[in-house]
Amino acid sequence: TKVVLVTTAQNKTAVNKDFLNNLIAYKEYITKTLGKQTEIVIIPSRYRNPTNNIEDDKNKASDWWEDDVEDFLFYGKVNFGNTLISCDSHISPTAKNPTEGYEILAEKGHVVLGHSKNHFRTLPRFRGDTLKTICTTGYITTKNYSRSKAGETGALLHSYGFVVVELKDKDTCYIPRNVKVKSDGSFIDITNSVDKNGVHKINSSL
């Protein structure tokens, strides 16, 4: 595998199907057209919304995700080059600063965390040391928050998105990059525009 596309899905929450379809199409494009074997990693996020109609006594004790994303879910730490994809860091989607406190995971280089916001920042280092970054993915699932102050804030800051992690050589990756996704599932990654009609090259001369 040369490229990993990382996003996050919340439990008991509908998936943005247009986003998922476009992400799969982009994965196939990178693999077949660009010749770089690509995989999709979806981080499972857990959140209990007591004001959701499906939160009855039977469902409170169980976690489930939409069938469409089950095959892409990862539940542990994924080491990819010098990037750590932390699929078991259970960060509340209403957290204001989701990367705070996770700097310790950046031992080798970069860290990717699952969260509903699109965050990216570089980490302190000594001169000559390897660049280290930490970022969050954004969600592939729709808004599903409690009717509370924290829930209302979380809904306002909810972002669709994913992170592209690409190997530079055997042991290192290029800096992971955030890709923001529109509500209709379309997105732009560098010079590639992806929507329901497929993947298109952007004319950089315009």
Please provide the spans of the model-predicted regions:
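Extended recognition/assembly regions associated with phosphoester-bond processing machinery
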Residues: 1-206
